[in-house]
Amino acid sequence: MGTSSDPIQDGSDEQQKRSEIYTYEAPWHIYAMNWSVRRDKKYRLAITSLLEQYPNRVEIVQLDESNGEIRSDPNLSFEHPYPPTKTIFIPDKECQRPDLLATSSDFLRLWRIADDHSRVELKSCLNSNKNSEFCGPLTSFDWNEAEPRRIGTSSTDTTCTIWDIEREAVDTQLIAHDKEVFDIAWGGVGVFASVSADGSVRVFDLRDKEHSTIIYESSEPDTPLVRLGWNKQDPRYMATIIMDSAKVVVLDIRFPALPVVELQRHQASVNAIAWAPHSSCHICTAGDDSQALIWDISSMGQHVEGGLDPILAYTAGAEIEQLQWSSSQPDWVAIAFSTKLQILRV
């Protein structure tokens, strides 16, 4: 990534190396994408298609370090009924559990990758509304890193559903908002937050399901909030994206209502945010201006004349729709734009 001021580690040997970029071209437009977490699967990602026809596709790809090519394995490419809105590998760094991949669309699905990598099988298809032929599409989900049997989903039907994937049963279903819920993020074992078309960020504690705390509301009524990122290294902070807005709002849950900082250097709508998995004060944002920007927000709360500037910037070949920061290799960020997946050393 090109430096726009001081790099994250000033003058370190890592920064002296040329930045590395690897590109994979998919046979279709990429929508959802994510990194594998397992230590034994470095540089492995899942990508999913955005096709109008039925079915869609999921591919698992991996960088071959010997020749610098990202390759797709035909055995690990499979059909998916609708375009997945999100995909996540099981948060299992130490490889103690089955190798699972989850996807959300009409239902939450869990896929098992065979130990010999010969195939991917559907393990579970989880439907929280079995009494109805109609189900509100799932807009997003998050896998609980502290308790990997728990996955939380968000839906257009205003609910958030907490699944126990080992029992394949609903733990809790909450009416979370007044309108569609667009994203959900865990902040600990029993705490999650969600954002909605009603313009609010709400925090829920599973020990007290009757109440939620409104952390933030859009300054203009009913302006949807579409994405939410919770800082894993410092859970006091979260970030959200306002629909069709070029700014990212960073919140401190101790001080509801007022953002601690607004990141305003994108030239078009922001589509994705990712907190650094290894640092409490770095966040990456990406959007329709084809830019991925990394910010150091350690000066939060101090007045910065003219607003905060990013410390790193990368310009892609088209609008960036998806962004993920690797938790197992924190010096790598992945972006997706059009039919291309790129992984970037930061």
Curated annotation (Swiss-Prot):
Consequences of knocking out this gene: Plants lacking LWD1 do not show obvious phenotypic alterations. Plants lacking both LWD1 and LWD2 are early flowering and this phenotype is more prominent under short-day conditions.
User: Where is the protein localized?
Assistant: Nucleus
- The source's superkingdom equals Eukaryota
Any single Gene Ontology cellular-component annotation: nucleus
Q: Name one Pfam family in it.
A: WD40
Q: Name one GO biological process term.
A: rhythmic process
> Could you cite one Gene Ontology molecular function of this protein?
transcription cis-regulatory region binding
Give residues where N-acetylmethionine occurs: 1
Main subcellular location:
nucleus
* WD repeat start-end pairs: 79-121, 133-173, 176-214, 265-305
Keywords, A to Z, come to: Acetylation, Biological rhythms, Nucleus, Repeat, Sensory transduction, WD repeat
User: What does the induction field say?
Assistant: Circadian-regulation.
In terms of PROSITE patterns, this protein maps to: WD_REPEATS_1 (PS00678), WD_REPEATS_2 (PS50082), WD_REPEATS_REGION (PS50294)
Q: What does this protein do?
A: Clock protein essential for the proper expression phase and period length of both the oscillator and output genes known to participate in photoperiod sensing. Required for the expression of APRR9, APRR7, and APRR5. Regulated by APRR9 and APRR7 at the transcriptional level, indicating the existence of a positive feedback loop within the circadian clock. May function to delay the expression of the morning genes until dawn approaches.
Entry protein name: WD repeat-containing protein LWD1
What are the leading ranks of the lineage? Answer: Eukaryota, Viridiplantae, Streptophyta, Embryophyta, Tracheophyta
Q: What gene makes this protein? A: LWD1
